[in-house]
Amino acid sequence: MSSNTVAQFATELKMPANVLLEQLRAAGVDLKSVDDSVTDSDKAKLLDSLRRAHGATDGKKITLTRRQTSEIRQADATGRSRTIQVEVRKKRVFVKRDPAELAAEAAAEAKAAAEQAAAEAVDMQPESVEAQAPAPQSVEALAQAPVEAVKPVEAEAPKIETPPVETPAVEAVEAAAPKIEASEAPAEPVQTQTAQAVEETPAPAETPEPVPAVKAEAEPQSAQPAASREQSTAQPVEPEAKKESVAAPKTQEAGPESVVHAQTDLNSKTPAPVAKSETAPSAPKAAQGRPQVAEAARPPVVNDRAREDARRAAEAEAAALREMLNRPRKVLRAPEPEPAGTNNAALSGTLHKPAGKKDAAAAPAAAPKKEGGNKPAAAGAGGKKVIKTAEVSSTWNDDASRKKPADKAAAPGGNSRDGWRSGGKGGGKNSRNGRNQHQDRRNESAAQEFIAREIHVPETISVADLAHKMSVKAAEVIKQLMKLGQMVTINQVLDQETAMIVVEELGHVAIAAKLDDPEAFLDETPGVSEAEALPRAPVVTVMGHVDHGKTSLLDYIRRAKVAAGEAGGITQHIGAYHVETDRGSVTFLDTPGHEAFTAMRARGAKATDIVILVVAADDGVMPQTREAIHHAKAAGVPLVVAVNKIDKPEANPDRVKQELVAEQVVPEEYGGDVPFVPVSAKTGAGIDDLLENVLLQAEILELTAPVEAAAKGIVIEARLDKGRGPVATILVQSGTLKRGDVVLAGASFGRVRAMLDENGKQVQSAGPSIPVEIQGLTEVPAAGDELISLSDERRAREIALFRQGKFRDVKLARQQAAKLESMFDNMGEGTQTLPLIVKTDVQGSQEALVAALTKLSTDEVRVQVVHAAVGGISESDVNLAIASNAVVIGFNVRADQSAKKLADNNGIDLRYYNIIYDAVDEVKAAMSGMLAPEKREEIIGLVEVREVYTISRIGTVAGCMVLDGLVRRDSQVRLLRNNVVTWTGQLDSLRRFKDDVKEVKSGFDCGLTLRGNNDLQMGDQLEVFEIKEIARTL
């Protein structure tokens, strides 16, 4: 009993092995894997199972496919030979009819024979092809047994060159079959290769599928109604026919379709064979409806003269086709450029057809399509639809004709958009004249004269875009940059200066420009200049050294207790408060005094009208006090000095005045313009005088701002809130900000969803000098960004995206420059890095902490801030820490549960801090631990050589006395002779009497040997020392 494996059986059946295995298991065959063997009985079980499942008792159709592959070499216009792969697939389909159905059809045939006998007898005489049909002479009789007509045709199909039965006209029409089939079934890739083989080889290749269809076209037009009716009847049946073959499911895809076409086109003589032959699986239902179909499908009787005329016309056309195909072939020549008015509709799509025969070939090919009556053929004859070689997606001529208008447009100006990306859609194998066109373009560009252009260079531009602007290849730009000493890639971003140098080196005129800058629209904001300016409250910033009492002073003014709730008792954010006093309203900005918050204080000075400089009476002028004075002077803001803590016994206001005079801050009593007010934040003494001086300064300044206008302001602080998203504290400087307004802040934009005042209460609008907290921005803006209210959200988005791209390009250009500069600096150095990820609660704290930590870097250990952002510590931060081996620092933020678990599993160090001092100190300690320890020598003893012995096995042994300290066996020693160091090394052994000892103390004698040195003399001294490692600190 023969057997093979499931995998081999699947290969024979041309189907996946796992699908076959499932079918065998469903049939009841117990198989474990595709490597198990399959017996004939198992195959029989599978066949029975499939027959039951598909409702068929016998195989109805067998398809045989033979494939042949060959190559054709053809020279093109440039003289290069081109190899073309040609694949010919020959297919035969045999259909077995059901005996019961044949009997029913024979009965129906006999019934209809009497009515149609005379007409059919006349039609059968002129043509020898119809000798293949059965004996009965009626339409219904031919409809009953179309398989007998199909089988002989299929049998003769491989011998198309010399058919024994067909007339010459039919043979010629058969040779043209691939073109007709191309319009009927444009989705079969197999017939593409077949059609190419027909036209590219001297003898026509076998194409059995379209043969019956071609015979039908040689017939008169009288069969059009019946053919169209039967075609619509046969189409729904095709899927059932495809299910019938179990052995070769994939190879049958073209089979049923070819049979449908063959039988449909035979209906020019026999109206209804297709429905009956293709609906064999559903015979009972089909048998009921056949009498009606036969009645409806009867064609009218046509006179013999019309048939004879149509046959002669078809013979003439077929003869012309045969003559054209038998002509000797010529070598393909490049087509001459056609004038603008030439009609390209008649061009053939075949690669190897001679150029001179295109028009001649198109006319005979169009005539049979008109005769056939098909819609696709009619469309092709009308010139509206391009007839392609076969079912291919595009023809070569199609691509060439598509390319011609573009070439004409590009040729006169010479400024083709191809540039370095030349090689458009038509290139490659599918382009008939692609190589010729590229060669012509190269010759054209070489012949063109150089044109100096004015190139507008933006702030940043990539190498590719710069080359495109100058209409040169990107390689030219890269080459020029290499000459200038810069290695770049095609996508690298260049800064404006470098790009302008390259443009000028290449002979063009460089113009620094900002093309299409959307920020130019911001200057056109209407309503600001027209609105009436009204008096506004002053914005007062409180500045000074840390712990000098700034927040406590504000607390007393606001009747609040903020300082008590702050971590470490120090301010680490900018606080904005609006206070209503008896003399009017004042907006206060409280800035941090710690040295790390320099940028925050600078922002506070820019946004303010008046600065209150707080100096402690017991402490005097300190570094941050001087820095605050410089910020105020740089911003051109008037100062009011508040000398705080005057209630303390050690307070000395006069010393403070003297120190401030040294800093160019002269009090009014000394002839200056700066008011000095002694205050106490604890008792409240002098607070009223301070507010009076502040409001007096505000009156002198005459502060005004438009109210009924679009809002403008500044971002004081920004943070990422887990529940509310990006939140920004802003100070409105002019106009009125309302809930629902579209705002733009730096590179972020959005619609104001909610506004809160400093007490957390909802407000609907905010006028000038009012601080509010807004929600609704797309991302966290940078502190210090300008905020503008716009009427159009689309414009706000456009400007924000432009700023983001600009910021990204500038950042990339800076990074590239920094990499190149630091590459050589760090080369050869053993610099260690401490990678950190910093997450803070607000933008300002992040800035300050990153600046303070980066400042700790030394030549040996460098702090590398891998990532710094606002918001809680998330899983993505921990993943980044895992990848970069970094320590995560959370400043006033915490990690969520998933991030904690991930950090614990991967050993990532999470550090939380509330005070900036602690974070800086711990990072400094970690960096100290990374420093290489300092090595120091420590002398622990002195030994004198009293006797020298030479022992053959050991060498020179010194008998010594320990004069000072001690000597250890693993110590290092220096040999001193006449107080001059002659050798440095280690002890080899140390003994006292006959015993090995670890150490010998002062006053005892011992014997010792030196490792690698036997040059010992009496009176030499040995200095014993140890090297100790001492930890270094920053």
Curated annotation (Swiss-Prot):
Residues 304-315 have a biased composition (Basic and acidic residues). Residues 535-702 form the tr-type G domain. Its main location: cytoplasm. Disulfide bonds: none annotated. It is found in: Cytoplasm. Keywords: Cytoplasm, GTP-binding, Initiation factor, Nucleotide-binding, Protein biosynthesis. Residues 569-573 are annotated as: G2. InterPro entries: DNA-bd_dom_put_sf, EF-G-like_DII, IF2_assoc_dom_bac, IF2_II, IF2_N, P-loop_NTPase, Small_GTP-bd, T_Tr_GTP-bd_dom. GTP binds at residues 544-551, 590-594, 644-647. One of the essential components for the initiation of protein synthesis. Protects formylmethionyl-tRNA from spontaneous hydrolysis and promotes its binding to the 30S ribosomal subunits. Also involved in the hydrolysis of GTP during the formation of the 70S ribosomal complex. NCBIfam families: IF-2 (TIGR00487), small_GTP (TIGR00231). This is Translation initiation factor IF-2. The lineage of its organism: Bacteria, Pseudomonadati, Pseudomonadota, Betaproteobacteria, Burkholderiales.
